[in-house]
Amino acid sequence: MLRDKPAAMVAASPKATVPVLVLEDGAVIDESIDIMRWALRRNDPEDWLAGDDTELIDRFDDRFKHHLDRYKYPDRHQAEPVAHRTAGLALLGEMEQRLATHTNLCRETRALADIAIMPFVRQFAAVDRAWFDAQPVPRVQGWLARHVASPLFDRAMLRVACWAPRTAPIMSSSAE
């Protein structure tokens, strides 16, 4: 569980949030997008870095995530969930327009922007699925459905035992 944080993780990254990647030289990377870019610079079989739209990813990591957290956890943030849901939907409207051009956010095939943003949209949709499904964003809904139905998503969401120091690493095969 996220509340059961290994001491080694907290020592490596005092902000104590997942993910944390400790490199062989001791350097620590503790932001999801930075870990993704680090990994893709080493192996990018689908050329995802070609779809690294930093501005779009940052907008969702910052503005959309802000509204998502307050919509999903209004008590924790002392927030009005409907106002934040509305603001999140406005950003999904921008995404809807973008998806009118391509099947994915930057091109026809998935890229880094899709993989970085999809978890936020998935969480937003899950708060009230019936409401989300009734919204006028059919391209976003289809985009999300395709990503969630992909074998890559199944492998990424595989449940594994909580990490502990000196445990064997869990390795994954190719993307699909």
Model-flagged regions — what are they?
Residues E46-D47, R129, P165-R166:
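A short hydrophobic/aromatic micro-motif that marks alpha-helical segments and, especially, helix-coil
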